[in-house]
From Swiss-Prot:
This is 4-hydroxy-3-methylbut-2-en-1-yl diphosphate synthase (flavodoxin). [4Fe-4S] cluster binds at residues 304, 307, 350, 357. Converts 2C-methyl-D-erythritol 2,4-cyclodiphosphate (ME-2,4cPP) into 1-hydroxy-2-methyl-2-(E)-butenyl 4-diphosphate. InterPro entries: Dihydropteroate_synth-like_sf, IspG_bac, IspG_bac-typ, NO2/SO3_Rdtase_4Fe4S_sf. Its EC number is 1.17.7.3.
Length: 416
């Protein structure tokens, strides 16, 4: 039998640290959560509001589309508005096709952005490709900005792909078309990074990404990239989809890669429901990193799934209420109660696992199941502290949780 430690996450891959507007990506820094707006960037009010919402939800970096003159002209105004709101969030400019022109024509935009994202597959075509790529890299050097070279399988460099397909055919097709495509994605990123360095962009100013839409392709491509370079890597499954499908696909793909020690920043690309909440993707990214033990963002509320013993919905309603209140209060609690993100709360529904799970939590309650004595023992720091009874068990436990937070983490804040 293999030792238990063999199943622990592999050590983080050594990568070059990149400073993105004060947020360190790579170099052993905690994996950074980022997101992207879906507003028209020229809509300054709408974009500022969404960036603020994403940042408040926990996005440490936010990417915005810069696709035309009006968008580029809006960027410094957006940056200024955010600063006046007291929001110091790095803005990433997402450029396709005409990024070289927009950066040259709008120097205030070039200065206001914390990083440029460029796609080697559409930065330019044929004889214009290298020149337009170089123009963007030179702008990054001039303004001392990092660059993410973001390859996407949907806009892959067709010249490179054709070349590799022809070479594979000449060798008698030893690789499948899918394997050749993976190799083309990897080579596109690495060759572009090499060219950027030749132009003069420092290695600590380059982040790579290789976006695909299938789980197995993401695992393969990032494993290849990680073995061939020490560049900081941005993980993300593009076009993951809506709802549970998108969450499951992103978690399956990035969870495996992160377990291998690969990845320095992540974005969960969920398609929101019509008029849905864009911050959902930030929440999922945080939860992925937290459940895997890589970072702590918010107190954990453990709750049993329910069974025939738990015909009452009290434990479900209480768990939901506590989780909702925690998420709502976290922006204030982070400042007021340092370390509160490490809190573990248990809300269990019957006697089978309730007491044991509650003992493992910092504070937990075991609510009575069907036919059980209508009493709810509360455990604090592993010890039974008291038993709640009566119609206000839920409200009483909520008050105990708040009291526990104030006593444990409020004292820490005062000491600091």
């Amino acid at each position: 039998m293999a030792p238990a430690e063999d199943f622990d996450p592999k050590p983080r891959r050594a990568s070059v640290a990149v400073d993105v507007g004060g947020v360190i990506v790579g170099g052993g820094a905690p994996v950074v959560v980022q997101s992207m707006t879906n507003t028209d960037t020229a809509d300054i009010d709408g974009t500022v509001a969404q960036v603020a919402a994403l940042h408040k939800a926990g996005s440490e970096i936010v990417r915005i589309t810069v696709d035309r003159d009006e968008s580029a002209a809006a960027v410094p105004k957006i940056r200024d508005r955010l600063e006046r709101l007291g929001l110091d969030v790095p803005l990433i400019g997402d450029f396709h096709y005409i990024g070289h022109k927009l950066l040259a024509d709008h120097p205030a935009c070039a200065e206001a952005l914390a990083k440029y994202r460029i796609n080697p597959g559409n930065v330019g075509f044929k004889d214009k490709k290298d020149k337009q790529f170089a123009d963007i890299i030179e702008m990054a050097i001039r303004y001392d900005k990092p660059v993410r070279i973001g390859v996407n399988w949907g806009s892959l460099d067709q010249e490179l792909l054709t070349q590799l397909m022809d070479e594979n055919q000449a060798k008698g097709f030893p690789l499948s078309a899918r394997q050749v495509t993976r190799e083309a994605i990897c080579q596109s990123a690495l060759l572009s990074a090499e060219l950027a360095e030749e132009i003069g962009l420092s290695r600590n100013r380059i982040i790579l990404s290789a976006k695909v839409s299938q789980v197995q392709d993401l695992i393969a491509v990032y494993s290849m990239l990680a073995s061939r370079s020490d560049h900081a890597l941005h993980l993300g499954l593009t076009e993951a989809g809506m709802g549970s499908k998108g969450i499951v696909a992103s978690s399956a793909a990035m969870g495996y890669v992160l377990q291998q020690g690969i990845g320095d920043t992540i974005r969960v690309s969920l398609t929101p429901e019509p008029n849905g909440d864009r911050t959902r993707e930030v929440q999922v990214a945080q939860e992925l990193l937290q459940v895997m033990g890589f970072r702590q963002f918010i107190p954990v509320v453990a709750a049993c799934p329910g069974c025939g013993r738990t015909t009452s919905t009290v434990f479900q309603e209480l768990a939901q209420k506590i989780q909702s209140d925690i998420r709502k209060n976290m922006p204030v609690w982070r400042e007021k109660y340092p370390g509160v993100e490490g809190l573990n709360v248990a809300v269990m529904g019957c006697i089978v696992n309730g007491p044991g799970e509650s003992k493992h939590a910092d504070i937990g309650i075991s609510l009575p199941g069907t036919g059980e004595n209508p009493a709810a023992p509360v455990f604090i720091d592993g010890e039974k502290a008291l038993t709640l009874r009566g119609p206000k068990i839920a409200e009483d436990f909520e008050a105990l949780v708040i009291d526990y937070i104030e006593k444990r983490y409020g004292q820490r804040s005062a000491a600091e």
